[in-house]
């Protein structure tokens, strides 16, 4: 299976949907911020590994705590994923903090600041 095949795209979407449900509804770890969302998932073509990009609303400490909580619940998440999705192999999940939303907000603020300065001149 190639990386961008239709089958792989469908698997990515299904894993992302299930991960969102598991994180939102089934994990009771207090370290995990309730405002955590799964932005994207990339499952390897051999279905052995997956990268889950998560976005956490909050400061850096909240992001670090959420990442630590998800890493400690990795085994539970993988077992639950195996029960809910019928795949040949259940991928080992690596959680990565997605900084793109923060970066976009920061760039938007900079653009607003520059346009404000141009209007004043």
UniProtKB/Swiss-Prot annotation:
GO terms for cellular component: cytosol. InterPro entries: KH_dom-like_a/b (IPR015946), RbfA (IPR000238), RbfA_dom_sf (IPR023799), Ribosome-bd_factorA_CS (IPR020053). Its main location: cytoplasm. Disulfide bonds: none annotated. SUPFAM superfamilies: Ribosome-binding factor A, RbfA. One of its GO terms (molecular function) is ribosomal small subunit binding. Keywords: Cytoplasm, Ribosome biogenesis. Pfam families: RBFA. Gene3D superfamilies: 3.30.300.20. GO terms for biological process: maturation of SSU-rRNA. It is found in: Cytoplasm. Monomer. Binds 30S ribosomal subunits, but not 50S ribosomal subunits or 70S ribosomes. PANTHER family: RIBOSOME-BINDING FACTOR A, CHLOROPLASTIC-RELATED. HAMAP family: RbfA. Belongs to the RbfA family. One of several proteins that assist in the late maturation steps of the functional core of the 30S ribosomal subunit. Associates with free 30S ribosomal subunits (but not with 30S subunits that are part of 70S ribosomes or polysomes). Required for efficient processing of 16S rRNA. May interact with the 5'-terminal helix region of 16S rRNA. This is Ribosome-binding factor A. It comes from Agathobacter rectalis (strain ATCC 33656 / DSM 3377 / JCM 17463 / KCTC 5835 / VPI 0990) (Eubacterium rectale). The gene is rbfA.
């Amino acid at each position: 299976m190639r990386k961008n095949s239709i089958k792989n795209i469908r698997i990515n979407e299904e894993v992302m949907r299930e991960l969102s449900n598991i994180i939102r509804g089934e994990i009771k770890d207090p370290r995990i911020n309730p405002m955590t969302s799964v932005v994207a998932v990339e499952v390897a073509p051999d279905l052995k590994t997956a990268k889950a990009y998560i976005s956490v609303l909050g400061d850096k400490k909240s992001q670090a705590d959420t990442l630590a909580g998800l890493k400690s619940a990795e085994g539970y998440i993988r077992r639950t994923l195996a029960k809910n999705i019928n795949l040949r192999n259940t991928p080992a999940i690596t959680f990565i903090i997605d900084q793109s939303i923060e970066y976009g907000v920061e760039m938007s603020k900079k653009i607003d600041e520059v346009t404000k300065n141009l209007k004043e001149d």
